[in-house]
Amino acid sequence: MNHLEIEYKTLLTKDEYNRLAMLFSHVTPVTQTNYYIDTIQGDMKSKKLYLRIRTLPTHGELTLKIPEKVGNMEYNVTMDCAEAKAMTKSLDFPDCQIKSILLERGVTLEDLTILGHLTTTRREYQTNIGLMALDVNVYADKKDYELELEVLDAEKGKDDFDAFLKENNINFKYAKSKVARFVATLKRDKD
């Protein structure tokens, strides 16, 4: 499945997270783990390609994100839990559109490795302004809190997100993507 992902996000303080958690109390949290993939040299990042395997309780997903003028084009392959778990060990790519795109873009599949993982406990539901997710993320020695809103219309979505934050007394705090925050911990560890 492919789609254009347009989302807005903000980091949250623990207090802001706890306040919003009350709005999401009707939603059962789901724990998912993202395994981030690149070469040791960062070839994927230099080509502006972002690749992950996500494991969830009921299935797994292989996802490739490619930045567009607005949002990211997202390519997804759904797999069962066993396939996803096996892929986190072997990185043996199924024949799929993602594999084809990587090869077309000159990525040497044998050089890819899993850099590490980030685990998210997510409460997600469809609101009247878009698909909203309240996340707790744990990676390396860090824990952060985040609110995301996925929308179809970039301009209206931005206005709706800003209004939601104001209505709920949330101060906007710029949030890099999860993969960027994760990779920043790798760079810090090297210093």
Question: What is the predicted function of each stretch?
Answer:
Residues 1-191:
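Phosphate-end processing signature that detects enzymes handling 5′-triphosphorylated RNA
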